[in-house]
Amino acid sequence: MATVPTRSGSPRQLTTKQTGDAWEVQARRWLEGKGLRFVAANVNERGGEIDLIMREGRTTVFVEVRYRRSVLYGGAAASVTRSKQHKLLQTARLWLARHNGSFDTVDCRFDVVAFTGNEVEWIKDAFNDHS
């Protein structure tokens, strides 16, 4: 877990959620620096969550943000399992339907922004509904 300094100067442990939120903010800023536009964050649909929804031109980009301190267990990108991909696809499908769209009518893709240590890896079109 990450730590942050407090007013007293002693570090305080961040919760897993706080750590995840901080990396999602970093990913959003990083992607905006690459020209993507922010749409939404932490989108929940029936138990699934999408970290970020961005736009690149006319493409809706669903982004999964991952962080690992090291590559010891495969790094951040390797942690997006088939099961997680399935859940992200289902959540995106529901979000699109709520916004009068579908995979057939909206140009979209699924990206992963993976932070491993101090490295950033942007995997465009990491998986799709045909995977």
Curated annotation (Swiss-Prot):
Gene Ontology terms, MF aspect: nucleic acid binding
Annotated region described as Disordered, given as residue ranges: 1-20
Biased composition (Polar residues): 1-19
InterPro entries (UniProt xref): Restrct_endonuc-II-like, tRNA_endonuc-like_dom_sf, UPF0102_YraN-like
Family per similarity comment: Belongs to the UPF0102 family.
Name recorded for this polypeptide: UPF0102 protein YraN
Natural source organism: Escherichia coli O8 (strain IAI1)
Lineage of origin: Bacteria, Pseudomonadati, Pseudomonadota, Gammaproteobacteria, Enterobacterales
